[in-house]
From Swiss-Prot:
It comes from Herpetosiphon aurantiacus (strain ATCC 23779 / DSM 785 / 114-95). This is Lon protease 1. The active site is at S693, K736. Keywords: ATP-binding, Cytoplasm, Hydrolase, Nucleotide-binding, Protease, Serine protease, Stress response. Belongs to the peptidase S16 family. Residues 14-211 form the Lon N-terminal domain. Residues 606-787 form the Lon proteolytic domain. Homohexamer. Organized in a ring with a central cavity. One of its GO terms (molecular function) is sequence-specific DNA binding. ATP-dependent serine protease that mediates the selective degradation of mutant and abnormal proteins as well as certain short-lived regulatory proteins. Required for cellular homeostasis and for survival from DNA damage and developmental changes induced by stress. Degrades polypeptides processively to yield small peptide fragments that are 5 to 10 amino acids long. Binds to DNA in a double-stranded, site-specific manner. It is found in: Cytoplasm. One of its GO terms (biological process) is cellular response to heat. Induction: By heat shock.
């Protein structure tokens, strides 16, 4: 203990000086650079009175808070006395502090112009029973220090001698802690430990770890030196060879090109396998005349290898709050979709932070499924933006050759890498977000099945060693984030679908289309057509006209085209010098867009018996269909037309059988088939149709036809029928309901068990549409058909004999 330490008494109240990036240990001399105005004021006041100050480490070791608050520094530190002080010309101070003892803050009693606090002294503890262990730890620290010293260039000999000769365990602990490589948090932990034995134990661990790091570093350095010696030898020999050739006049462009490729190969950061392959091909290139056909093939191959981003990657730190802002800014609505995406991103970020040994990409692969124009591709772009990654789109529509994914072997003329490797090359990084667009449009032929190649690409257990046929070296795809899009799941093979996490995107409501148009489409189209906001304005009613009268789609792609047409017309007026702003009202909108394209057909098409409005699902969204039934003089034949599939034909047969069995209860003559043929037609005959969901609509159409009762013009229905008249649940409820709402239908009949699906319907649609859940087709008839008949029901003479044309085999005519 020094003379200063023996004679200095630490008062109960002292000033507090926060330290940035270091911790003050007792029984040491600590140099300080003091530049903060409040700290300079503190030191000046100290020199005028008591020279003792409390040194407390700031918790943030990288940046000093401004202002410094009590919670910004540790409450346990050390008391020190100013030993030496020097003022510099720039006004800052250099001080040498004699650190005395550990102290702890009891209470802050002053905050301005600097902190003062009540403190209590916290002396270190050393039990007699721990003396042997402490002695052993001191010797261990000395041994480790002796091993570390030769591994660190210019290691101070005086420091090693001090460590080896120090007999005071407390002084040794603080001496070693002062020079050891530790973070502020670890340094503070050493200071906070009351037991000297525990301090020495922790320092023993720190020194052992540092020794291991230094030894491994020395081994690596030795290996690098050996490699450098070999490389330098080759370099010297090549330089000598070039000099000899230059003297002989044999220097040519080929050598220059080969040397350039060699330098680029070394700088590319390739994997060991790729580097070995590249050098092998480069040696072949050296020996090959430039006129050889294979020369350009090898050169192209090497340039492709060099251009790949072997070591370049984006910093993909995910901020979930920022991701939320990006998704909300780029897309209106889609709340459930956004929630699922944010959950996915949060899991990736937690896995990256808490389980770095696990590949963060080994999670689910998102697949957005929905109609065209609902934002699948733009969602993928927003995810890349939220993750700070490069985005690249890979269109798979119409791909039917496996080589388009895996690449062509170099034995073929014009061989190229597969589209996946080319996409990564275009992105410039090895961890882009790759959007596999239209994955449901993959097909196969005699050249292979690209779906099989996609299985390897999307499987985390296999894609770490993806081997493109052209490259013929392994490429790690695990850093790549894949997102797929599709219009339907029906054409995606089951093994591929199992690797995807499906997120369904439904149709937009009228309100959502209006919001998307006003927030995104109108400003974007205005900018694309070089129009200023004060030159063209579209009012509320005009947008509704464009949506309701000129588009009928699940997404907004066609709506964007119509808005683009309006902007082109407005741009023409501006170019002609018309007064601005040009206000697009409903009248101008209709003038610019031409004749109306879509009308509400419900009342017009359901004003006679035998016509029913049904609901269908298609890969491009929901739609309404009109099922038409008619009768004619005949002998009981039953015809179907409209390109109906087998399932839909069976639904029609089931509907007819139920009508024949139960029709008398609804006033239908049981012998109607003696003099009449029936024909059920589903318009839009060029479009194939199938599925069981039109069963109740067909039964209702037949009952309407045979009873003369007309369907209510605001009703549509969907549901499967059984021979007993039971109504079974169906799928695609959301798309069908939105299609009905777009068409102006305000009453929808659904199977009872499908009412649970209404929670997927937007609230504004639910408020405008009345839903009826049914379990039997009889309920459908009572809800859908008007009570009075507009035509006389079908009747036949009582003496007529019923032919058996409906008895067993029904003749189905498909026109």
């Amino acid at each position: 203990m020094s003379e200063v330490e023996r004679t200095t008494t630490i008062p109960d109240e002292i000033a507090i000086l926060p330290l940035l990036g270091t911790v003050a240990y007792p029984q040491t001399i600590m140099p300080l650079a003091i530049g903060q105005p409040e700290s300079i004021r503190l030191i000046d006041d100290l020199m005028a009175g008591q020279r003792i100050v409390g040194l407390m480490a700031l918790k943030n070791e990288d940046e000093r808070p401004n202002p410094v608050l009590p919670e910004d520094f540790y409450q346990l530190g050390s008391a020190a006395v100013v030993h030496k002080l020097m003022k510099l010309p720039d006004g800052t101070l250099r001080a040498a502090m004699q650190v005395l003892e550990r102290i702890e803050i009891v209470e802050i009693i002053q905050t301005e112009p600097y902190y003062r606090a009540k403190i209590r002294v916290m002396p270190d503890a050393l039990a007699e029973s721990e003396q042997l262990e402490v002695t052993a730890l001191m010797r261990s620290i000395g041994t480790i220090a002796s091993q570390i010293a030769p591994l660190i260039p210019q290691f101070p000999t005086e420091l090693l001698n001090s460590v080896l000769s120090e007999e005071d365990p407390r002084r040794l602990a603080y001496l070693v802690a002062s020079y050891a490589r530790m973070s502020v948090t670890d340094r503070q932990a050493v200071l906070a430990e009351p037991s000297i034995k525990q301090k020495l134990l922790k320092l023993n661990e720190v020194l052992t770890r540092e020794l291991n790091v230094l030894q491994i570093g020395q081994q690596i350095q030795s290996q690098v030196q050996d490699e450098m010696s070999k490389t330098q030898r080759e370099y010297v020999l090549r330089e000598q060879l070039k000099a000899i050739r230059k003297e002989l006049g044999e220097n040519n462009e080929q050598e220059v090109e080969v040397d350039r490729l060699a330098e680029q190969i070394e700088a590319a950061g390739m994997s060991a396998e790729a580097h070995q392959q590249a050098m092998r091909e480069l040696d072949r290139l050296r020996q090959m005349p430039t006129a050889a056909a294979e020369y350009s093939v090898i050169r192209g191959y090497l340039e492709t290898l060099i251009a790949l981003p072997w070591q370049k990657r984006s910093d993909d730190t995910i901020d979930v709050a920022q991701a939320t802002e990006v998704l909300d800014a780029d897309h209106y609505g889609l709340d459930e979709i956004k929630e699922r995406i944010l959950d996915y991103l949060a899991v990736r970020e937690l896995r990256r932070k808490r389980s770095p040994e696990r590949d963060p990409g080994r999670g689910a692969i998102l697949c957005f499924v929905g109609p065209p124009g609902v934002g699948k591709t733009s969602l993928g772009r927003s995810i890349a933006k939220a993750m700070n990654r490069e985005f690249v789109r890979l269109s798979l529509g119409g791909v039917h050759d496996e080589a388009e994914i895996r690449g062509h072997r170099r034995t073929y003329i014009g061989a190229m890498p597969g589209s996946l490797i080319q996409a990564i090359r275009r992105s410039g990084v090895n961890n882009p977000v790759v959007l596999l667009d239209e994955i449901d449009k993959l097909s196969s032929d005699h050249r292979g099945d690209p779906t099989s190649a996609m299985l390897e690409v999307l499987d985390p257990a296999q894609n770490t060693n993806f081997r493109d046929h052209y490259l013929d070296v392994a490429w790690d795809l695990s850093p790549v984030m894949f997102i797929a899009t599709a219009n339907t799941l029906q054409t995606i093979p089951a093994p591929l679908r199992d690797r995807l996490e499906i997120i369904q995107l439904g149709s937009y409501t009228m309100r959502e289309k209006y919001e998307i148009a006003s927030r995104y489409l109108v400003p974007e189209q205005r900018e694309q057509h070089s129009l200023a906001p004060n030159e063209v304005e579209i009012d509320h009613e005009a947008l509704l006209v464009a949506i309701e009268e000129y588009t009928r789609e699940a997404g907004v792609r066609n709506l964007e085209q119509q808005i683009g047409t309006l902007m082109r017309k407005a741009a023409r007026q501006v170019a002609l010098g018309s007064a601005t702003p040009i206000v697009l009202d409903p009248a101008k909108t209709r003038e610019y867009l031409g004749k109306r394209r879509y009308f509400s057909e419900i009342h017009e098409r359901t004003d006679r018996p035998g016509i029913v409005t049904g609901l269908v699902w298609t890969p491009v969204g929901g739609d309404i269909i009109f099922i038409e039934a008619t009768k004619m003089t005949g002998r009981g034949n039953f015809a179907l037309s409209g390109q109906l599939g087998d399932v839909m034909k069976e639904s029609a047969r089931a509907a007819l059988s139920w009508v024949r069995a139960e029709g008398e209860a609804y006033g239908i003559d049981p012998n109607f088939a003696q003099h009449y043929d029936l024909h059920v037609h589903v318009p839009a005959g060029a479009q194939p149709k199938d599925g069981p969901s039109a069963g109740i609509a067909m039964a209702t159409a037949l009952v309407s036809l045979l009873t003369g009762r007309v369907l209510r013009d605001d009703v549509a229905m969907t549901g499967e029928i059984t021979l007993r008249g039971k109504v079974l649940p169906i799928g695609g409820v959301r798309e069908k309901v939105l299609a009905a709402h777009r068409a102006g239908i305000r009453t929808i009949i659904l199977p009872q068990r499908n009412l649970a699906d209404l929670d997927e319907i937007p609230a504004d649609v639910l408020a405008e549409v009345q839903f009826h859940g049914v379990e039997h087709v009889g309920q459908v008839i009572e809800l859908a058909l008007r009570a009075e008949a507009s035509e006389a029901p079908v009747s036949v003479p009582e003496s007529a004999v019923m032919p058996n044309l409906f008895q067993s085999d029904v003749e189905v005519l498909v026109h």
